[in-house]
Amino acid sequence: MKTLTIDFETYYDKQYSLSKLTTEAYIRDDQFEVIGVAVKQSGGETQWFSGTKQKTKEFLNSFDWGNSLAIAHNAMFDMAILSWHFDIKPKMIADTLSMSRAIHSVEVGGSLKALCSYYHLGAKGDEVINALGKRRIDFDDDSLARY
C-alpha cells in the first residue's frame, strides 16, 4: 500500500490558535486558512504547495488517497482539514503523535522538535513561529519555500 505523509500549515495568531480553541472550533472558524501543505508519496520527494483553496484541492486530488495510508503528526488536525475542507478521506490513517506518546510517554515529548532531536533527524526550523499573524498572501515566494 502506498503511503502519503501530509502536513498542513495554517493561519494562526495570538487569539486564534490551537492553544486557545478546540481542534474542531479552530478548523471550522471563518478565520481558518491553509497557508500551504506538504505531501510526500511513499519514498519520493516532499512536495510543498501553497495556493487558493480551489488550487490546493486540485493539488491534493492528484494523489490516490482512497488507496493509501495517510501519515501525519497529530493526524486529528491534518485529517480533519483534509476531510472537512477538501472532502478527501484516506483509506487508512497513521498518527505519529499517538505513536510517539505510546512509545515514549512523557520522557521525550510529543512535539516534532523533540522527536527530531531524539531520533537525530535534523533540526525543526522556526518558520512556523515566524508565521504568527500572517495570511497566505502576506508571504513572499522565498518565505513560502522555507516554510
Q: What does each of the following model-derived ranges do?
A:
Residues 32-39, 43-147:
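Active-site-proximal helix-loop-helix substrate-binding element of RNase H-like nuclease domains
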